[in-house]
Amino acid sequence: MAFTFKQFHIDDGQCAMAVSTDGVLLGAYAPLTQAKSVLDIGAGSGLLSLMAAQRTQADCQIVAIELDQNAANACQNNVNNSPWSKRIKVVNSSIQAYCDDLASLSSQVDNQTAAITPTSKFDYIISNPPFFENGPSSQSPERAAARHTHNLPFSALFNAIKSLLSPLGLSTIILPVQSLESATLAYQEAGLKLSCQRFIASVQGKSPYRVILCLQHLSAGDILLALGAGKSLNPLSETSLFIRDNQGQFGPEMASLCKDFYLKL
């Protein structure tokens, strides 16, 4: 299926996971406008990478990592047809292999060549990851890989974010609310902390079904606080953002976030 936004076009016909409202909301919500380097983990059709390119300055470079070959090809085609083809690099790889390749490259760099080696750290990391931890798998292996965590468990995702995020960087992901507890254990074990979280309801008045997490590195002070006082590092959650009101229209915050992307806003 094809989707036309205000500044770019997405064809996701070869992708296991189609463009979704969740993805558009994540791309619009993430506070990445000042980033100079962005990593999109599990890029799929390239939606988040293209939204990041639209929202950042011209000197921001974006890397889109996608495991599935067909999706990576679709992502590359969508990037090539966008205004930002020179700013987005598509890599057909797992994030685990990408981390290993960067580590191998770093080990081969001496002090004389370090200055010209591309940075392996990113100001911002964004991901709409596979998040179903159990339940029936899709009949399509590609769709199963895109939806279920067996290829990218939370531990691997958050360890990759920990490894690739710059010291003052920020990462934003979206998950089902039922995955929040296991995700929290995984990001804390990886050495990350919650900067903010936002619950998402599909309709005004309904219980949240998704949660957006903003993560950053633990500081030395955070570690001492946790060890010494046993206090939670998680701030209080904000009120839920609802996608549609009871009349089926976009809620005011949703409309404000997405007005630069959706044609009819």
Swiss-Prot record:
GO terms for biological process: tRNA processing. Its main location: cytoplasm. It is an enzyme of class 2 (transferase). Disulfide bonds: none annotated. SUPFAM superfamilies: S-adenosyl-L-methionine-dependent methyltransferases. Its EC number is 2.1.1.223. GO terms for molecular function: nucleic acid binding; O-methyltransferase activity; rRNA (adenine-N6,N6-)-dimethyltransferase activity; tRNA (adenine-N6)-methyltransferase activity. It catalyses: adenosine(37) in tRNA1(Val) + S-adenosyl-L-methionine = N(6)-methyladenosine(37) in tRNA1(Val) + S-adenosyl-L-homocysteine + H(+). Belongs to the methyltransferase superfamily. tRNA (adenine-N(6)-)-methyltransferase family. This is tRNA1(Val) (adenine(37)-N6)-methyltransferase. It comes from Shewanella denitrificans (strain OS217 / ATCC BAA-1090 / DSM 15013).
